[in-house]
Every structure is written in structure tokens, then in C-alpha cells.
Swiss-Prot record:
Binds 2 magnesium ions per monomer. Catalyzes the transfer of the phosphoribosyl group of 5-phosphorylribose-1-pyrophosphate (PRPP) to anthranilate to yield N-(5'-phosphoribosyl)-anthranilate (PRA). Mg(2+) 2 binds at D222, E223. It comes from Natronomonas pharaonis (strain ATCC 35678 / DSM 2160 / CIP 103997 / JCM 8858 / NBRC 14720 / NCIMB 2260 / Gabara) (Halobacterium pharaonis). One of its GO terms (molecular function) is magnesium ion binding. Its cofactor is Mg(2+). Mg(2+) 1 binds at S90, E223. This is Anthranilate phosphoribosyltransferase. Anthranilate 2 binds at R164.
Amino acid sequence: MKDYIRRVSDGEDLTQAEAREAASLVFEEATEAQIGALLSALRAKGETEPEIAGFAEGMRAAARRIDPDRSPLVDTCGTGGDGHDTINVSTTSSFVVAGAGVPVAKHGNYSVSSSSGSADVLEEIGVTIDAEPPAVETCIEETGMGFMLAPVFHPAMKAVIGPRKELGMRTIFNVLGPLTNPADADAQVVGVYDEALVPTLADALSRMSVDRALVVHGAGLDEIGVHGESTVAEVDGESVEQYTVTPSDLGVDSHDLSAVAGGSPTENAADMRGILEGDVEGAKRDIILANAGAAIYIAGEADSLAAGVDAARESIDTGAAAAQLASLREFEP
């Protein structure tokens, strides 16, 4: 670990394999001072794509992993930290995706930077959020969807809580959550808080085991937005293509950003229920359609983003999305 700290402090980039080993040392034997020193040095130097991929692989290796017998598994998970308290877009979208027949292994946590994280809103709406890995695996196989709470599946992360808190700044771990799905999802939609991270995380994902992914940033949001142009990087194996999409490209209307504002977990749970049951129209429904459609597309279940949005719309309008919520609430670990 001392060698890695020295080299990174001197401005040297680590290889992906070295970054993976450094992550293992962080989780297994490094002191808090060493962890803080490495994270600070990486931040000062600037984390490279191979370093991000290597750390993500090391974090995955330390996780409690599951292997549900459903495919293609998809995850919708963002970095958070975009500074906008919107409704719970990726979480609500997950039910729409699963309702469309695409199995979902949702990875998430309690809120860090917003009023309501995925775990907060799911707990409020009556879903068991802290199930053990075998139970989540069964849940995905039986209902088509499961929620993996980060602290349950990533106990090794306890080692970095203290150093991260004391540093008080963003580190490489702020972008690793979406890259460390414990079910090794086949396809992902990854939202990022900074547009500059779109090509960075797309490149990192292309170096990992994910088959297909969309890395997205929507005019200030770590989601595909419905208030302007969104930047998208599409990962297919080792290839990456970057482009932009507008709401009209997806077949939804444009809205003001303020129209997708969220609130407390209670308020966001009410919005989630209303959207899934077809009682909420307008911007909040449209942003869910856009992001659910993206997940359906990248899972290979639609030929285009717009076709994915059509499938998402059908999931809500037929009652399938609401039924998916009911089945997850009723599942007993």
C-alpha cells in the first residue's frame, strides 16, 4: 500500500490490475491513514478509467454476490450528487422495467446528497430493503425484481467510512456504486452527476464484465432529463458511442426542471405510487418513461430508445408496473 500511495502521490497512474489490488488492500489491511492518503492522492492526480475499473472490480470481489437465474438482468443506478432533489427516478423506473418483463437487480442505498434515496422511498412504500443476499436472489427469481441494499452487500465498505468522512470531499468511491452491482447485471443505466464523467465511466465500464450500458447525464441531472438535451454514452462490450437525445427523440414532452422536483420519502413514495398506478401525468410520468425506456432498450428488449419508451408506457398503462410494486411489497424474505 505504501508503494501505491507514493507512486500516485508522484503523479503516476496505476494499471487496472494494480488498482484492483490497491482496492483489496483498502478493504483488507490498510490503516485509515493509508486509505485517506491514497484517496487524496488519487483525487489530486485525477482518477483514470483503468483505476476506476480496477477499484470497481476490487469492490465487487469484496461484495456478497448473488447469481439469480434470470436474464438479461438490468440495473438502474446513478451516482447521485447532482444537487437537485427530484423524485426517485431510477427506483420508480425499475418497477416499470420489471413490469415490462425485464428482470431487475436494483442496487441502492439510503440518501447521501438528496432528501430521499432509493432505500428511503422503498422503505416508506413498504418494501423490505435489508434482505440478505439469498433472499434477494430468490426474490428476483420469483418476482422479477429485487433490491440490494449497499451496506448489506458491501460490508467491506465499512473500512472507508471514517476516512471518507474525515476527508470531506468527493473521492473515487463517489462513482463506484453504480459500477459494483452484486448480481453482475448484464445491462445497466448509469446516471452521473457531472457531464464530464459520461465518457469516463463509459470507458471504465467497457473494461469490465458488463455486456451493455448507457451512461447518462441530463442537463444537470444524473438521469435522462425531460427539460433539455441529455448526453448518452452507449457501451456495447468494449465499444463506446456517445450521442445526445432530446425528449422529442424519445417520444415524450419537454418540461421545466422544476416539474420533476421531489420531496421527503413520504412525498416521493406518493409520487411513485401515483406514477406506477397511472394516476400521475406530465413531467413526472415522462421522466420515468424516458429512463425506464432506456433500461428496456439497453437490456436488448427494444430496438431503440423510443421503442423502449413505448414498452415502458405499456407497462404502466396495462397495470403491470403497479403489479410489480405489489409483488415486491408482498415478498417475504
